[in-house]
Amino acid sequence: TSQPLNFSTVYFGGGSPALCDLAPLKDVLSSLIPHPSSLIPYEFTVELHPLDVTEAKLRELEDLGVNRISMGVQSLDDDILADMQRGYTFADAEAAFQMVKRYFDNAGIDLIVGYPGETTALTPRHARLAKWGLRHCSVYSLQNERGLKNVPDDETVMNRLDITARFLAELGLQRYEISNYAIPGYECRHNLAVWRGEDYIGLGEGACGRMGLKRTVGRKTGVEESEVTPEFDLKERAFFRLRTREGLDTTALQSLPSYPFLRATLDRNVVAGLLERDGLVYRLTERGMEVCDAILAELA
């Protein structure tokens, strides 16, 4: 585009981004954001693998302007971490996060729920985790891409997610999106912008972007571009909000020919106890949080 772009967030993730040479990234950032500290609000997140964490790397990230760290811990169980082939123990992750906190107050972790052999009850390691000073936690259900055996059923996974949610609530982390919890004020601004329907640019293989009606996906051969209809764009941006505690405001959808169907579908989920309605705004209930994808599929 020939028009200047204003950025308020940067998210450097996917794989283990901190393993790469940061010099090219500095060049890209300096061309996009000459003065990052002048952007309000400004959030620059980098995802870290626990084994990537060193004093030198953290200082380098700090000098780059990073002010938020997300560390992929995945599990508190050493046997599960070994089966995941993560290459570290819970104690290693704990030490890495303590080092991160010396440089970055705004730091959180990712966890995966539903792995075979996972205990339902809280363990002494949860008590240790409570002392980490977490500002944010993303909790995802296992996607069984490896074809693991003895994967727990959906009801068991939902029970474990509920236990995890209550544990995080005791630490002051509130659920603000179906998979994300934060101390108030530490919500991920970058992801919130996406869920609120704002435009964003994705750089790199597999990264998606949205600018107006244009959609992009990074491929090995370059950037694949497509264009959606105004109706699709309006619905997509609105439906993303359903993932959050803010909920789906249907005001802008009333002009669509499909609005009666959308309204009937939403109201049916209210009766089912999966949504709650406040005027023209629909929000997921706790039960609805666990089946959000199914509700969105109904609306598509």
Name the predicted role of every residue range:
Residues 281-285:
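Minor-groove-contacting beta-hairpin "wing" of winged helix-turn-helix DNA-binding domains
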Residues 1, 5-33, 40-259:
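C-terminal scaffold of the Radical SAM
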Residues 256-271:
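Short amphipathic alpha-helical interaction segments
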Residues 270-280:
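A short, conserved structural fragment
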Residues 243-247, 271, 297-300:
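Generic surface-pattern signal
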Residues 235, 239, 263-267, 296:
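Generic detector of well-ordered alpha-helical segments enriched in charged/polar residues
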Residues 287-300:
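Short, amphipathic alpha-helical interaction segments positioned at domain boundaries
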